[in-house]
Amino acid sequence: MARASARGSEFHTVDSGEVEIRWDGPIATVFLNGVESSAIHTDDPSILEFEYMQHANCALDAVFPAPQRIRALHLGGAACALPLAWATLRPGSRHSAVEIDPGLAGAVRDWFDLPRSPALSIRVGDARAVMCSMKDASFDVIVRDTFDEGKVPAHLRTTGFAREARRVLKSEGLFLLNCAHGGGEDARREIASLRDEFSQLCSIQDPKVGRSGRRGNVLVVASNCAYPIDELDRRLRTLPLPARVTHGKALEKWCAGAKPFLDPEPSSQGVGVAQGADSTQSEDLASKARA
């Protein structure tokens, strides 16, 4: 049950901890164990509050202009703010979100007016295990937005993970990764992990974050088709807080010396820790389990 506070917040308990939904008018910001996780504008879900989600929207629009239909895989569900926005902006699209927390995956439909399947399906499981179960060339875009205590899980940033993402993407598809940088995290190593699988790479970030002056988000865009950098740059300049694209020689210079993340060698007991455990179920099964 939710319990309201004088600040206009409500609190819920899920498998991974406590969720606070903090309301500011129609905007609901979701915190998981005190860490800002999602924000939904309930009056107009197409409005994206988080800057990195605005960057992801620009990156997608540069290749697949709205309202073009897409099929998207979202690794990391939380409150499904980005799938909801894209479902609103692109009617007829199909979104699959993967959330590792069964309680959270089921509860977000009670908290927010999310589209039902097939517009938006929510699957419970490990992001990599679910992606590895997908057929080749299934998606136009894959979004990786997964964090555990402020860090991207190790098995979701390796060369092997990038290889699986390329397999599941269509030939003209986009791989969008929300990376942490600064404060002990290095997005440049994530870019290095993508190089063997994706020929077109760029990053979007605040210049201060790029210089490691402060911790922040870096959105990495990966593709194997000619990516319209100029169009992306034009769209980013229209945002309330314009962002900078780093690509080509500038990206090579920024990432110089960065070493890719590798999966551990498989042991005789089976797949290494970085692969993650396959623990998936449909949202319907998850709902029945909670009933």
Regions found by a protein language model. Name each.
Residues 18, 92-94, 117-119, 172, ...:
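A generic structural signal for alpha->beta connector loops
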Residues 35-39, 147-150, 175:
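A short, flexible beta-alpha/helix-coil linker loop
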Residues 39, 111-113, 151, 155, ...:
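Residue-level preference for alpha-helix termini and adjacent loops
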